[in-house]
Amino acid sequence: MAAATLRDPAQQGYVTFEDVAVYFSQEEWRLLDDAQRLLYRNVMLENFTLLASLGLASSKTHEITQLESWEEPFMPAWEVVTSAILRGSWQGAKAEAAAEQSASVEVPSSNVQQHQKQHCGEKPLKRQEGRVPVLRSCRVHLSEKSLQSREVGKDLLTSSGVLKHQVTHTGEKSHRSSKSREAFHAGKRHYKCSECGKAFGQKYLLVQHQRLHTGEKPYECSECGKLFSHKSNLFIHQIVHTGERPYGCSDCGKSFSRNADLIQHQRVHTGEKPFTCSECGKAFRHNSTLVQHHRIHTGVRPYECSECGKLFSFNSSLMKHQRVHTGERPYKCSECGKFYSHKSSLINHWRVHTGERPYECSECGKFFSQSSSLMQHRKVHTGEKPFKCNECGRFFSENSSLVKHQRVHTGAKPYECRECGKFFRHSSSLVKHRRIHTGEIQ
């Protein structure tokens, strides 16, 4: 890096808003994610402070105060900037006012000429319709890449782009400006939460954080009445009502209303699973899925059935269970019209019509239509009999066999013949008995 001393500002004419602004269109602004917009807000504040210290902003206190207390950093602040411009804060301000503030800066030799072009003669103030001004200091180094990337509005907000502070300003500055800049670069956090002790570098971040403790949600959607703790979340939510989906997947063309949703979706194509369970090492595509999975290890069951009090780890499991009480059977077989309460039950039933038997016994090669049938069959090979009769101590390989056996002890005969009213302990016995009435058995 070669040191280059800037020309005497007094020889460079007037500084206008065009000299210290980069524009984004509304479309370009949408390409920025929340983190980039937050960085934009932070550097806006720094640039305002710098311009004020150089005597280039007559309404220093008002503008800086607005930015410091700016509650929502994710929305464009061109209203603040424009109001200052229209009042003539910069228009016609001579660069010689900052002559005693001149400094030596580190500039790549290949970019010295380009860097000096910032300080050319007076240009008329001209507001570009529909574009968002992003302030930058006339002492901020601009890389060629940053200037070329204005079309997409991405590198302009990266750490290597136009918003990165690459120079230390020397000379006399106001006490407030120096203190603000020192805190900005040193990463100091003066605003502390009285509830949890977490500290923040800027007041608006503390205000937003405190809503976690108070539960305050001051932003209401005018369409559906839903409340939000942050204005940015409200703006993102409102896209649902407009139907706008500006974020498109380059792999499959699917569109999303939020950039975060697009990022999550792209993991389907990349196979990325960044969320890993610390207990078993299983990886997941979404953090919410990991949170749900973790309940398997902790045993947490936060969802309770209001009818019977049974607890569930997942809300989806509770909803399925509640169909036992409501009798709801939303899944219908298109072949025979039979209804089922669970989709998995319909899938299993469908194999009756298709004849599909996807489950094979590794011991004898026999196929089954349901995995439960295969599991029961395997006990024939293993000799396992986990079901014990409490009356006589006899063991059975299947629970259904135990239930049938227990009727010997209870005397239960649940199967009735409609012809003669006779009862039977097993359905197979009833089937045989019916043949007497049909004439099959003489």
Swiss-Prot record:
Q: Where in the cell is it found?
A: Nucleus
First and last residues of each zinc finger (C2H2-type): 191-213, 219-241, 247-269, 275-297, 303-325, 331-353, 359-381, 387-409, 415-437
**Record keywords, A-Z:** DNA-binding, Metal-binding, Nucleus, Repeat, Transcription, Transcription regulation, Zinc, Zinc-finger
Q: Which CDD domains match?
A: KRAB_A-box
The chain positions of domain KRAB read 15-86
Which Pfam families does the UniProt record give?
KRAB (PF01352), zf-C2H2 (PF00096)
Q: Which InterPro entries match?
A: Ikaros_C2H2-ZF (IPR050589), KRAB (IPR001909), KRAB_dom_sf (IPR036051), Znf_C2H2_sf (IPR036236), Znf_C2H2_type (IPR013087)
Its biological purpose is as follows: May be involved in transcriptional regulation.
Family the UniProt entry places it in: Belongs to the krueppel C2H2-type zinc-finger protein family.
Protein name as catalogued: Zinc finger protein 773
* Primary gene name: ZNF773
